[in-house]
Amino acid sequence: MDFWLWPLYFLPVSGALRILPEVKVEGELGGSVTIKCPLPEMHVRIYLCREMAGSGTCGTVVSTTNFIKAEYKGRVTLKQYPRKNLFLVEVTQLTESDSGVYACGAGMNTDRGKTQKVTLNVHSEYEPSWEEQPMPETPKWFHLPYLFQMPAYASSSKFVTRVTTPAQRGKVPPVHHSSPTTQITHRPRVSRASSVAGDKPRTFLPSTTASKISALEGLLKPQTPSYNHHTRLHRQRALDYGSQSGREGQGFHILIPTILGLFLLALLGLVVKRAVERRKALSRRARRLAVRMRALESSQRPRGSPRPRSQNNIYSACPRRARGADAAGTGEAPVPGPGAPLPPAPLQVSESPWLHAPSLKTSCEYVSLYHQPAAMMEDSDSDDYINVPA
């Protein structure tokens, strides 16, 4: 067998394994229900089928080909609403055997064209399952402190469900049955408008007015008793659930901002810590760089030590004068002949300062002391000599 034929064998299986959207519908015994189904864009056969428990196949209940199953003749109608993209199937005079699994679909093949799964549950009006169900209690660890608790909501016991049977719909005044122990009161059916204003005193209308109102209600097609009953129960459960979820939601509304605030504080602390560490690292690098620059400058200086200078010598800071000038001054003196007498001893002047002399100012002015030779110091009378003792 060719391999390309194998996917054809899995087509029915894939259609059976497709997950369909499921809708649950509940109805009262003897009442009616309306099932909403999606309407395809193409003009094809649409139907409502019921799944058989034994074989698993889906048998057609009603379709657009004017087919109605024998069990539902006179009790089921199918209407199309193209503008809303849906079609409605209304089933009246419900019985307990009508409970089961239904499916909406489109196409000629009933088993493969399913678009929606519908579960119908038919029950009596006084079934115990319709009593108020207690809400599950929240765990003790989830209870909020006293400061964060919300005020208690109204108790759900204030809502009283009134159920009537089809046999009691024609009776207007209430009938009281007395007994030695208990008292049971059967109340007539109350419409939605009268249930809202239930605290007001009741007024009974004349028979002519009642007949006119009944005729008007017949023209306007009032809602079925099952629908009204479902509406009241659904509203009651929604209020109970809303009060419970409101208390739980209040705790989450307080807990979430607290966690976010702590998370933001932790992030801010990390950012500040990183900034401080970076600043410290930059300061350490700057210090190390300064130390390296100082060491580099000291290593580049010449290592030859300067000539030590005496602190007491005032001329140590002045540069030395070249000796060429002194040589030039001494070279002008005439040299005495061999027969000439020796010149007298030159005048010796002590260069040491006097004791009473004030301290000399340090300056770079040069003081030149020239010793004039004896030949230059002679007068016209060469025989006169002046001897200065040393």
Swiss-Prot record:
Known partners and oligomeric status: Interacts (via Ig-like domain) with IGHM (via CH4/Cmu4 domain), both secreted and membrane-bound IgM; the interaction is glycan-independent and multivalent theoretically involving up to eight binding sites for the IgM pentamer.
Location in the cell: Cell membrane; Early endosome membrane; Golgi apparatus, trans-Golgi network membrane; Lysosome membrane
Additional remarks: Expressed in lymphoid cell lines such as Jurkat, CEM-T4, MOLT-4, HB11;19 and Reh. No expression detected in nonhematopoietic cell lines including Hep-G2, HEK293 and HeLa. Detected at high levels in chronic lymphocytic leukemia cells.
Record note on modification: Phosphorylated on both Tyr and Ser residues.
Keyword annotations from UniProtKB, A to Z: Cell membrane, Disulfide bond, Endosome, Golgi apparatus, Immunity, Immunoglobulin domain, Lysosome, Membrane, Phosphoprotein, Receptor, Secreted, Signal, Transmembrane, Transmembrane helix
SUPFAM superfamilies hit by this protein: Immunoglobulin
Location of region: CDR3: 106-115
Gene that produces this protein: FCMR
Stretches of the chain found on the membrane's Extracellular side: 17-251
Cytoplasmic side: 273-390
Compositional bias of kind Low complexity: 293-311, 325-334
Chain positions covered by the region annotation CDR4: 33-115
UniProt signal peptide: 1-16
Membrane topology note: Single-pass membrane protein
Protein name, as recorded: Immunoglobulin mu Fc receptor
Outcome when changing T181A: Impairs O-glycosylation and trafficking to the plasma membrane
Region (CDR1): 40-45
